[in-house]
A protein has these predicted regions:
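Beta-strand-rich domains and repeat architectures in extracellular enzymes and scaffolds
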Residues: 7-46
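Repeated scaffold domains used in trafficking and secretory/extracellular systems
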Residues: 16-21, 64-83, 132-147
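Short beta-strand elements that form the blades of beta-propeller/WD-repeat-like
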Residues: 23-39, 83-103, 141-162, 198, ...
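N-terminal, post-signal-peptide region of Sec/Tat-exported proteins
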Residues: 33-70
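Conserved Ser/Thr-centered positions that define the repeating blades of beta-propeller domains
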Residues: 48-50, 115-121, 148, 160-167, ...
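Blade-loop segments of beta-propeller domains
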Residues: 55-99
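Beta-propeller fold detector
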Residues: 56-62, 125-132
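Short, conserved, GDST-rich strand-edge loop motifs in beta-rich repeat architectures
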Residues: 96-109, 162-176
Length: 303
């Protein structure tokens, strides 16, 4: 590092902006944006449950420092819809990369969409990235998230869904995808489907007394198996066996996938379905505290 270069010192940020409710589930449960400069400049988002006496920060420790303020607020930046309709303690609050972070969509780090999920009424939350390919904040404005008692459902409604649409993985949101909670983790229904398909294919291979039935599994490759046979199979025989396995797999996949996933209709629904921040409310003064020496600098918000 040259002598002319300086390492920017971390400064903690405090503002006089009043807390504002940006999302409400019901009269007792809501999100607040606090300690912000403006709706798109920093601050911390908290989940509040006045009935249970819960207030939980949705974010990280570095959210309080000026570097994060320059990158906006990831929760408030989310422009899609969110319906919290579970009554068993499940909650989810999506967030998204801000324009300061994502820019024009050419960011090397991508523009992830994520959500915070709780299974204990908001006492604790886990963090889950659900998509990385979004190019700008506007790109995920059509994302729909619904929380029900059996998990979190989500879909990018800007994409066309047809009768053959099905999730091809956790990050595929072209059709309704679902995550269920188990042992502290969120598991994609796609993983469940693949496990079921593998089990049913193996059962069918055993029933048909295929020679490789007991070896079949998620990592099985028919041509790798065929290369081990002696005497070797002819080209036509290899293709015949591979096609037979493929037909079994496709038939069982169609059977497992046929009903697809639909958004549930929760018995209750949140009052709000989108985050709403009043852009007219801003901080008047901002206090920066230097972490190394405790020196404070108070400035007026000129925005």
């Amino acid at each position: 590092m040259s002598g002319s270069q300086k390492v920017e010192e971390s400064r903690k940020v405090e503002t006089d902006a009043p807390a504002q409710i940006i999302y409400r589930i019901d009269k007792n449960r809501y999100l607040t944006l606090e300690n912000y400069i403006s709706c798109d400049r920093g601050g911390q988002v908290y989940y509040n449950d006045s009935q249970r006496g819960i207030k939980t920060h949705l974010g990280w420790d570095n959210d309080f420092y000026d570097f994060s303020y320059r990158r906006g607020n990831n929760i408030a930046a989310y422009q899609g819809s969110i319906i919290n309709g579970a009554d068993n303690g499940y909650l989810a609050f999506p967030g998204a990369s801000t324009r300061q972070y994502c820019g024009s969509g050419r960011s090397e780090t991508g523009c992830p969409v994520f959500f915070f999920f709780s299974a204990d009424h908001g006492n604790t939350f886990i963090y889950k990235i659900v998509a990385m390919e979004y190019s700008t904040p506007e790109r995920f404005s059509q994302l729909k998230v619904v929380v029900a008692n059996d998990g979190v459902y989500l879909r990018d409604e800007s994409k066309t869904e047809d009768s053959y649409s099905r999730p091809t993985g956790l990050n595929d949101l072209s059709s309704v995808n679902k995550l269920r909670f188990s042992d502290g983790n969120l598991i994609s229904v796609y993983d469940d489907w693949q496990k079921k398909i593998d089990e049913l294919v193996k059962e069918e291979l055993i029933r048909k007394k295929m020679p490789y039935a007991n070896e079949y599994g998620p990592r099985f490759h028919i041509f790798d198996y065929l290369r081990t046979l002696t005497p070797p199979k002819t080209h036509e025989e290899r293709n015949l066996m591979a096609n037979e396995l493929s037909e079994i797999q496709i038939r069982i996949e169609d059977e497992v996938y046929k009903d697809g996933i639909k958004f549930p209709k929760p018995s209750t629904s949140s009052i709000d379905v989108k985050y709403q921040c009043n852009k007219n409310i801003k901080a008047k003064t901002i206090t920066y505290t230097n972490e190394s020496n405790g020196k404070k600098e108070v400035v007026k918000n000129e925005q």
